């Protein structure tokens, strides 16, 4: 009896080796950027959206951005004065915790700060986000929805029915109150009705100067990285 292709064994050693190679490549890339660019900025991200971070990468093609893999970035830069790649880079590693990233650039502090201060994009809130404002729906026809959507709206909790083939809201309905922690159902309803509440924002927090080795704070402080147990994003590291 021929063996099924599904029975093919995968060598864990090969998988581990590939993962190690990827980490080593990232370490080399980071150190190359340290040697190439004048400035290194640490940024934090609110309401992370991969598509919007990609837009920023495209706008900053003259520079390099890394996001995620905090532990690997810490290894590349060094965690202490004794093993840091260049002077004061251990100060950068201390701040690599949570949804933060690195921007390597030759643009000045003023140029970077001005661009990112102005940049903001709205998107739909997700479950677990807080409602930015109260949303209430008035009764009446919901002509933006095809009749086939009515069962789904009802399942989400809306008091709807079909009247002459038109989806109709039968009574007032409060989707959420300002400050509510949104449920998956509330987030879905807000998206269906076009209410954007999540502000995607990148904030510059710190700067490291490669020529002087100076490390300085630019925004509100970030908590220092704890240890190996630091939770990190699985987002793509680089473009």
Curated annotation (Swiss-Prot):
Where is the PTM Phosphoserine found along the chain? 225, 229, 233
Q: Where does the UniProt annotation locate this protein? A: Nucleus, Nucleolus; Cytoplasm
Q: Which InterPro entries match?
A: Mrt4, Ribosomal_uL10, Ribosomal_uL10-like_insert, Ribosomal_uL10-like_insert_sf, Ribosomal_uL10-like_sf, Ribosome_Assembly_uL10
What is any one GO biological process for this UniProt entry?
Answer: ribosomal large subunit assembly
Matching entries from SUPFAM superfamilies are given as: Ribosomal protein L10-like
CDD domains hit by this protein: Ribosomal_P0_like (cd05796)
Q: Which UniProt keywords apply?
A: Cytoplasm, Nucleus, Phosphoprotein, Ribosome biogenesis
Stretch list, region Disordered: 215-239
Single GO molecular-function term? RNA binding
Broad class of the protein's primary localization: nucleus
Indicate, by first and last residue, each region the UniProt record lists as having compositional bias (Acidic residues).
229-239
Describe the family membership recorded for this protein in Swiss-Prot or TrEMBL: Belongs to the universal ribosomal protein uL10 family.
Q: What this chain does, per the record?
A: Component of the ribosome assembly machinery. Nuclear paralog of the ribosomal protein P0, it binds pre-60S subunits at an early stage of assembly in the nucleolus, and is replaced by P0 in cytoplasmic pre-60S subunits and mature 80S ribosomes.
Q: How does it assemble?
A: Associates with the pre-60S ribosomal particle. Interacts with MINAS-60 (product of an alternative open reading frame of RBM10).
The protein's name in its UniProt record: mRNA turnover protein 4 homolog
Q: Provide the species name.
A: Homo sapiens
């Amino acid at each position: 009896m021929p063996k099924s292709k599904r029975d093919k064994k995968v060598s864990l050693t090969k998988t581990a080796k590939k993962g190690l190679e990827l980490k080593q490549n990232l370490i080399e890339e980071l150190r190359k950027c340290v040697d190439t660019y004048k400035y290194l900025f640490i940024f934090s991200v609110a309401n992370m959206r991969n598509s919007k971070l990609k837009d920023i990468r495209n706008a900053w093609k003259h520079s390099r951005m890394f996001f995620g893999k905090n532990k690997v970035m810490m290894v590349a830069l060094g965690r202490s004065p004794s093993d840091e790649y260049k002077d004061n880079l251990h100060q950068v590693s201390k701040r690599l915790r949570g949804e933060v990233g690195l921007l390597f650039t030759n643009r000045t502090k003023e140029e970077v700060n001005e661009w990112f201060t102005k940049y903001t994009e709205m998107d739909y809130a997700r479950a677990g986000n807080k409602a930015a404002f109260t949303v209430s729906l008035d009764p009446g026809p919901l002509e933006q929805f095809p009749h086939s959507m009515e069962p789904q709206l009802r399942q989400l909790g809306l008091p709807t029915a079909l009247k002459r083939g038109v989806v109709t809201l039968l009574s007032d309905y409060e989707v959420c109150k300002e400050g509510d922690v949104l449920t998956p159902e509330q987030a879905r309803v807000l998206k269906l009705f076009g209410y954007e509440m999540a502000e995607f924002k990148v904030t510059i927090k710190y700067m490291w100067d490669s020529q002087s080795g100076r490390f300085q704070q630019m925004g509100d402080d970030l908590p220092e990285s704890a240890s190996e147990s630091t939770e990190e994003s699985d987002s793509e590291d680089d473009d």
